[in-house]
Amino acid sequence: MSHTTHPYQKELEVATLAVKRASLLTKQLSDSIVQTARSGTLTKDDKSPVTIGDFASQAIINHAIKLNFPSDEIVGEEDSQELQENSSLADQVLSLIIKIQQETSVYNDVVGTLTDKNKVFQSIDYGNSQGGSKGRFWALDPIDGTKGFLRGDQFAVCLALIEDGKVVLGVIGCPNLSENIVSNEEHSGVVGGLYSAVKGVGSFYSELFKEGTEPLSQQKPIKMQNHTNPSQLKVVEGVEKGHSSHSTQAEIKAKLGFDPTTVAKQTVNLDSQVKYCVLASGQADIYLRLPVSDTYREKIWDHAAGNILIYESGGQVGDVTGAPLNFGNGRTLDSKGVIAANKEIFDKVIDAVTEIRKSSTPRV
């Protein structure tokens, strides 16, 4: 299928502009939080900035989807109850939305505008779909990587289209991701990346804060590397130890033959689905997210867009057994953990995980 002819042209345009608008809003908010924190006026327990960002981002994107595809359902992370019970918070959310709509008014014809609180509430609550294995729905994470967002570090706005349980389109806006983040040069390249994938077409990179949309034929195709030598491999993992088992992941790297003296330099810790983007663009080779408990189930919005980005860039994604992730099971994945890697090394990673699982407690 060519870059210019695919059946998701309109969906990609809407998703791109909505994610761009939401990314700009969340970037501005994140930057202001960091400034406030530096001045000492933001307390550690103050969750309102990220709450405002989550609500505003979800409202913008859900509204754009429903405006263009009224029969589509959306699986979103938030609902509007807290906002409806807090008038001050709702005012702040609406104010931010109106401001960003004015700044990106060239997008209004495609993604629409929100002008009152009731419409904001309604748009947020469009995200109440339960998903499933039949039909068509979108999966949205309005701010993926809350801690990174609050630190002014990595976070992402993630949107995927799922048809009959299969991801067919993904768009990830990474406001603080530089094009060559894993290189030795500190934050080299353009900051702010948009990563897109369409089933059967490929994965692509473009500048997030460049106005408008470019056809895929004008975007930069991205491909995973096929490194297999342990000395060449780079691993991306989460920052938060509560989200994945770093100790088990260390065992896996040892089993794969990583040199203990260099393994730290070969491991990159990043928040959010930014990890998938780094992998898909060939800057890393393995993504490890091993479960911290036997009962934890991943949310589909945390992985759907990243999943197609990896496949369309030539990689492979699975759970700890190597089985593909199932996005037709409702709002959560019925699987343990997530592992992504280039196709040359994927089976070896799964073999290492299997060996460690056999010799460990049932948790892994």
Curated annotation (Swiss-Prot):
- Where, by residue number, does Mg(2+) 2 bind? D141, D144, D302
- Any binding details for the cofactor? Binds 3 Mg(2+) ions per subunit.
What positions does the entry give for Mg(2+) 1 binding?
E77, D141, I143
UniProt entry keywords in alphabetical sequence: Amino-acid biosynthesis, Hydrolase, Magnesium, Metal-binding, Nucleotide-binding
Cofactor section: Mg(2+)
* Pfam families, per the entry: Inositol_P
PANTHER family reported in the protein's UniProt record: 3'(2'),5'-BISPHOSPHATE NUCLEOTIDASE, PHOSPHATASE
**Annotated protein name in UniProt:** 3'(2'),5'-bisphosphate nucleotidase 1
Which species is this UniProt entry from? Candida albicans (strain SC5314 / ATCC MYA-2876) (Yeast)
Biological classification of the source: Eukaryota, Fungi, Dikarya, Ascomycota, Saccharomycotina
